[in-house]
C-alpha cells in the first residue's frame, strides 16, 4: 500500500531524514521509533506532502505520489493528524469536523461524523464548543477525528 524508496526529506537545506526505505502492507500496524530529532514526524509529514521531498520516491498503491501536492495526496486517501493539532480554534467542534468533508467531499457527512463520534463520544457532548476551549485531550481527539472524516486509506 505504501512504499518509501530511498526517501530523503527536509526543510530547505536541512535534511531531516536521509535515504530511508520502508514498505507497509495493508492491514498492518507499523511504528516509527527513534530518538528526538531522528526524522520520524518529518517522514510522515513528507508522505502527506507537508515537508519537502529531496530525493527518492513515495509509492501509494500503484501510484507514484512523490510530486503530488498535499491536497492531491488527501484525495488519494492520505490523512495526517499533526503534532501541533492545527485546529481552527475559533470554529466549533462541529465546524472543525465539517472541514474534513470540505477538503474531501462526501455525500455521507452524517455517517462519517457519527463514526467519529462513536470513536470519541466526548466530542459529541462538545459539538457547539469552540475548539480553542477544549482540553488538550479533547483537542487531540478532534484533530484525529477531523483526519478520519476524510475516510483515509492511510
Regions from the PLM with identified roles:
Residues 33-35:
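The feature captures the beta-strand-to-loop junction immediately N-terminal to the Walker
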Residues 56-63, 76, 109-113:
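Conserved ABC transporter NBD signature motif
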Residues 151:
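Conserved catalytic motifs of ABC-family nucleotide-binding domains
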Residues 48:
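Helix-to-loop junction immediately C-terminal to a conserved catalytic motif
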Amino acid at each position: 500500500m505504501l512504499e518509501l524508496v530511498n526517501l530523503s526529506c527536509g526543510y530547505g537545506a536541512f535534511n531531516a531524514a536521509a535515504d530511508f526505505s520502508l514498505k507497509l502492507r495493508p492491514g498492518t500496524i507499523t511504528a516509527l521509533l527513534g530518538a528526538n530529532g531522528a526524522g520520524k514526524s518529518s517522514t510522515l509529514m513528507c508522505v502527506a506532502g507537508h515537508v519537502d521531498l529531496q530525493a527518492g520516491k513515495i509509492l501509494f498503491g500503484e501510484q507514484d505520489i512523490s510530486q503530488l501536492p498535499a491536497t492531491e495526496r488527501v484525495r488519494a486517501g492520505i490523512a495526517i493528524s499533526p503534532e501541533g493539532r492545527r485546529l481552527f480554534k475559533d470554529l466549533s467542534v462541529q465546524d472543525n469536523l465539517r472541514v474534513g468533508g470540505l477538503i474531501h467531499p462526501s455525500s455521507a457527512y452524517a455517517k462519517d461524523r457519527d463514526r467519529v463520534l462513536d470513536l470519541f463520544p466526548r466530542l459529541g457532548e462538545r459539538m457547539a464548543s469552540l475548539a480553542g476551549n477544549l482540553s488538550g485531550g479533547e483537542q487531540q481527539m478532534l484533530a484525529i477525528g477531523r483526519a478520519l472524516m476524510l475516510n483515509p486509506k492511510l
